[in-house]
């Protein structure tokens, strides 16, 4: 069975595409990757935002500019979630389904659980 992100179509990882397709201040999940020569989206990184998916995805542009060979982030996919808990569960599933625990993703650690301490809610964004 092919693993699925359950995120729909991919978009070019540009400021324009991000702004055009993602509503501000939404909780959700995302994946960065590229299309192989058969047009299949190859997942390189999975993540989530508990506060602002649109802003979080823009970090991928900066990563790619830093090291294009390592961060082969040409396109992104995304989906919204209703709660940080829901986004976290999906991130864990995406991480496992796409071999994060086997070193197939750029993610350097298992997904972090949501931080429910309101005073430090920004820490879950890193």
Regions picked out by a protein language model, each given a short descriptive name:
Residues 1-44, 48-126:
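Boundary/linker segments flanking structured domains
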């Amino acid at each position: 069975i092919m693993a699925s992100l359950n995120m729909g179509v991919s978009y070019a990882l540009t400021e324009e595409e991000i702004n055009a397709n993602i509503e501000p201040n939404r909780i959700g999940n995302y994946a960065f990757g590229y299309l192989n020569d058969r047009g299949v989206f190859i997942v390189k990184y999975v993540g989530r935002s508990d506060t602002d998916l649109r802003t979080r995805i823009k970090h991928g542009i900066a990563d790619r500019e830093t090291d294009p060979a390592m961060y082969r982030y040409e396109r992104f996919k995304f989906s919204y979630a209703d709660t940080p808990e829901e986004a976290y569960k999906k991130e864990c599933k995406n991480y496992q389904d796409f071999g994060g625990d086997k070193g197939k993703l750029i993610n350097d650690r298992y997904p972090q659980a949501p931080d429910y301490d309101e005073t430090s809610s920004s820490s879950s964004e890193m």
